[in-house]
UniProtKB/Swiss-Prot annotation:
Coiled-coil intervals, chain numbering: none
UniProt similarity note: Belongs to the bacterial ribosomal protein bL19 family.
Taxonomic lineage of the native organism: Bacteria, Bacillati, Actinomycetota, Actinomycetes, Mycobacteriales
Function, in words: This protein is located at the 30S-50S ribosomal subunit interface and may play a role in the structure and function of the aminoacyl-tRNA binding site.
GO (cellular component) term, any one: cytosolic large ribosomal subunit
UniProt-listed SUPFAM superfamilies: Translation proteins SH3-like domain
Protein name: Large ribosomal subunit protein bL19
Superkingdom of the organism of origin: Bacteria
GO MF annotation: an example: structural constituent of ribosome
Key word Ribonucleoprotein present: yes
Keywords: Ribonucleoprotein, Ribosomal protein
GO biological process assignments: translation
């Protein structure tokens, strides 16, 4: 075992479901406003997963009022309350950057059967 793996192991989360690029997910993020804390849901398509171990991140893209919004989250972040997989997508790429250029029905991802 690597020294860094030994240090990182206590911070790794085991409650994260398996998801891949192309999947539509709900990310429940803890938002702190002053003294209050609330959950905010960010629903979108996973366009990439990157890195490994404690440094692993994923990027979720959604359309909000006609504007594309992307947000990158660390997988093992304590600010993520939980993640729900809504649908499984059927894609042939690991990085779905081409979705940035597509609009409307063309940006739709087929669902896995």
């Amino acid at each position: 075992m690597n020294r860094l793996d030994f240090v990182d192991k206590p911070s790794l989360r085991d409650d994260i479901p398996a998801f891949n690029p192309g999947d539509t997910i709900n990310v429940h993020v803890k938002v702190i406003e002053g003294a209050k804390e609330r959950l905010q849901v960010f629903k979108g398509v996973v366009i990439r997963r990157q890195g490994g171990g404690i440094r692993e991140t994923f990027t979720v893209r959604k359309e909000s009022y006609g504007v594309g919004v992307e947000r990158t989250f660390p997988v093992h972040s304590p600010n993520i309350d939980h993640i729900e997989v809504v649908t499984r997508g059927d894609v042939r790429r690991a990085k779905l950057y081409y979705l940035r250029e597509l609009r409307g029905k063309k940006a739709k991802i087929k669902e896995k059967r």
